[in-house]
A protein has these predicted regions:
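Short, acidic, metal-binding catalytic loop of nucleotide-sugar glycosyltransferases
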Residues: 24-33
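Acidic donor-binding loop at a coil-to-helix junction in glycosyltransferase catalytic cores
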Residues: 185, 206-213
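Conserved donor NDP-sugar-binding/catalytic core segment of glycosyltransferases
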Residues: 102-151
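Short beta-strand/loop segment that forms part of the nucleotide-sugar
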Residues: 33-43, 63-67
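Short, flexible, basic/aromatic active-site loop/helix in glycosyltransferases
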Residues: 137-179
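Glycine-rich, basic loop-to-helix element that forms the pyrophosphate-binding segment
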Residues: 68-85, 102
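Short aromatic/hydrophobic "clamp" motif used to bind/position activated sugar donors
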Residues: 90
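A conserved acidic beta->alpha catalytic loop
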Residues: 40-50, 97
C-alpha cells in the first residue's frame, strides 16, 4: 500500500530567497496531499516571513520546526522533524533544491516496505540559480533541458536526468554506476524505519551526514532503489563556509566505524542514549 501521510522535510538556514524558489516548486506538485516541513537550523526573521507568505497563499500545508542558531546542527533539527511528525512517510530535501512537478508523486508511487529511494539532482551555476523567477518555476519551463542551456547552464550528460520518457528513465536507473545511496537532496523512506535506527547521527556535521544515515539503514536490513533519473531537483548554487577539513575527517571516521561494525543505531540521535542497540 502507498503511504497514507507524506511529509517533505526541507532543511534551511538563512537562505530565504532560495527557500522561496523551492516552496514555489512544491506549490506545483502533481500530488498535492503532503505536508511541507521546514526544518530550520536557526534562521532569522526573513526566513520566517517567507514561510508565513507561503502559508498565507493557502496552497501548501506547512509546518515550521525551528531551533536556536548555535552553529551547524542540521542533524538535530532533522531529528526534531522526524520525532514530531504524524506523517508515515518522509521525503528529505534541502531548501536550495527546486523539485520537478512529479517528485512527490514519484516517491509515493515507488515507496515500498524495507526500501529507501535515492533520487537525483542537477547542480545549477550561480548565475542560473539567481536568474530563476517564481513565475518560471511555476510554469515548469526550468526543467526543460534546452531552456536551461539557453539560460546559461553548461551542456552536460547530467542533464539526461531531465528525460521525460519513463522507459529511458528506467533504463538509465539500471545502467548508472552510481550507488543508490541516501542523498539528502532527494531521498525518502518510512518514518518508522528512521525511528528504528534512531534518526540522524548528531555527532555528524557537514559532509556525509546523509550517506551515514543510508549506511545505517543498509545495516538495519533496508535495501535501496535507484530513482535518480525518475525524479530530480535543481540544486541552487551557494557558498559553503561551514565545510572544514577537520570536520570531514571526523565524519569519515564515524562512517568508517559504521561500516566496520555494521552498526545501525545512532547513539546520539533522536533518543539520547550512548548504549548501542542490536
Amino acid at each position: 500500500m502507498p503511504p497514507e501521510h507524506i511529509g517533505v522535510v526541507i532543511t534551511t538556514y538563512n537562505s530565504p530567497l532560495w527557500l522561496a524558489k523551492v516552496l514555489a516548486g512544491y506549490e506545483q506538485q502533481s500530488h498535492r496531499d503532503f505536508t511541507a516541513i521546514i526544518a530550520d537550523d536557526g534562521s532569522g526573521d526573513e526566513t520566517r516571513a517567507v514561510v508565513d507568505r507561503f502559508r498565507e497563499r493557502g496552497i501548501l500545508r506547512l509546518e515550521h520546526v525551528w531551533q536556536e542558531d548555535q552553529g551547524f546542527r542540521k542533524c538535530r533539527i532533522l531529528n526534531r522533524a522526524i520525532a514530531n511528525t504524524a506523517c508515515d512517510y518522509l521525503i528529505f530535501t534541502d531548501g536550495d533544491c527546486i523539485p520537478e512537478p512529479n517528485l512527490v508523486a514519484t516517491h509515493r508511487r515507488l515507496a515500498a516496505p524495507g526500501y529507501f529511494l535515492s533520487g537525483g539532482y542537477i547542480k545549477l551555476t550561480l548565475p542560473v540559480s539567481e536568474s530563476l523567477t517564481e513565475e518560471e518555476i511555476a510554469s515548469g519551463i526550468i526543467f526543460d533541458r534546452d531552456w536551461l542551456i539557453a539560460r546559461g547552464q553548461p551542456r552536460s550528460h547530467k542533464l539526461w536526468k531531465l528525460l521525460r520518457q519513463p522507459w529511458k528513465q528506467n533504463l538509465l536507473n539500471r545502467m548508472t554506476p552510481a550507488a543508490a545511496s541516501w542523498n539528502g537532496m532527494n531521498s525518502s523512506t518510512w518514518t518508522r524505519d528512521l525511528v528504528a535506527v534512531n534518526g540522524f547521527n548528531e555527532d555528524m556535521q557537514y559532509g556525509g551526514l546523509d550517506r551515514e544515515l543510508g549506511e545505517r539503514l543498509w545495516n538495519y536490513g533496508h535495501k535501496s532503489r535507484q530513482i535518480r533519473f525518475s525524479t530530480v531537483c535543481l540544486h541552487l548554487d551557494h557558498g559553503r563556509g561551514y565545510a572544514r577539513p577537520e570536520i570531514w575527517a571526523k565524519n569519515r571516521a564515524i562512517r568508517k566505524a559504521v561500516k566496520r561494525d555494521r552498526s545501525w543505531w545512532a547513539s546520539n540521535g533522536i533518543v539520547k542514549s550512548r548504549a548501542a542497540e542490536r
